[in-house]
C-alpha cells in the first residue's frame, strides 16, 4: 500500500538539500525532530510553496505555478492534479488535526494524520491508513514548535521523535498563500464527502486557483486565501458515477456567499461555527461521468468579490 509519509519524507529531504535556494531554514531539535521554517522567520518562496503543497498531499499530486489574468490583471495561480484524490486530499492534505500543547496552537495537515488517524472516521470512510516509521506534518502557525510539541506529535503517530518532520508556515506568507490555494481540489473532495458522495468513486481531480497577494496580517490573509478558492477556484473531476447531489458542491450554494470571507467572519463575531459550512468549497466544478461520458458543470467564478478581498487598486 502507498505510504504518504514515506513519499512525503523524500520531498522534505529534497527541500533540506536546497534550503538557501528555497529561502527556508531547518533546525534539528534536542530530541532529534526536524522543524522546517517555511515562512515564520524566513521569506519562503514559490518553489517552497509548491513542495510544501506536495508534502501536504503525501507526494501523490503534481503541483505547479502559472501566471494568468483575471479581468486583465495578472495573478499567479496554483495548478495541480492527483490520481489518488481520496488519499491525497482527505487522507493527507485535509487540515483535520488541531495541535494544542501548552500555549502552542497550530492547524495540522499532511501525512502524519494518516498515522494518528485524525479524525478516525475519515480513514474509515476512505479505507486507508499508513504504517510508516516516519511522520511528516505541515503546521499552519506563526510560531515554530518546540521539543514538547514534536514529542506530542511523535507519540500520537507512534514513531520516534527523531523520525518526525514538521513544515511550518503562517497564513500571511508566500508559502501560506500557495499552500492554501493548493487545497483547491481538496475543498471539492471534502465538500463531496460532506454531502454524502463516496470519495472512493472519484478517479482523479485537477484544479486551478489564484494565489492571494500577501495581506497585512494572518486574519486578513485567512480571508483572502479562502476567497481565492470560494470565488475563483475551479476543479475538474473524473468520477465513476455522477450524482445529482454534486450540484450542491460549489460555494455559491451557501447562504453566506457573496461577500469577502473576512467580512463574513467579522459579522459572525469571529466564530467559525456561525458560518455556513457550505461556503468552504470551490467556486466552480466540472464533473466527468465515466458511466455516461457526460461532463456536468456547476458553480461560477466571481472576480468582483475576489478583487475586494485582495484589496486590488486599479488605475482610474
From Swiss-Prot:
Catalytic activity: 5,10-methenyl-5,6,7,8-tetrahydromethanopterin + H2O = N(5)-formyl-5,6,7,8-tetrahydromethanopterin + H(+)
Notes on temperature effects: Optimum temperature is 85 degrees Celsius. Requires a high salt concentration for optimal thermostability at 90 degrees Celsius.
Transmembrane domains' residue ranges: none
Span of the signal peptide: none
Associated pathway: Metabolic intermediate metabolism; lactate oxidation
Alphabetized InterPro entries for the sequence: METHMP_CycHdrlase
One annotated Gene Ontology cellular component of this protein: cytoplasm
Compartment annotation: Cytoplasm
Main location: cytoplasm
Keyword tags: Cytoplasm, Hydrolase, One-carbon metabolism
Pfam families cross-referenced by the UniProt entry: MCH
EC class of the enzyme, as a word: hydrolase
Gene Ontology biological process terms, A to Z: lactate metabolic process; one-carbon metabolic process
Keyword Cytoplasm: yes
Job of this protein: Catalyzes the hydrolysis of methenyl-H(4)MPT(+) to 5-formyl-H(4)MPT.
Subunit note: Homodimer.
NCBIfam families per record: one_C_mch (TIGR03120)
UniProt similarity note: Belongs to the MCH family.
Protein name: Methenyltetrahydromethanopterin cyclohydrolase
Native species: Archaeoglobus fulgidus (strain ATCC 49558 / DSM 4304 / JCM 9628 / NBRC 100126 / VC-16)
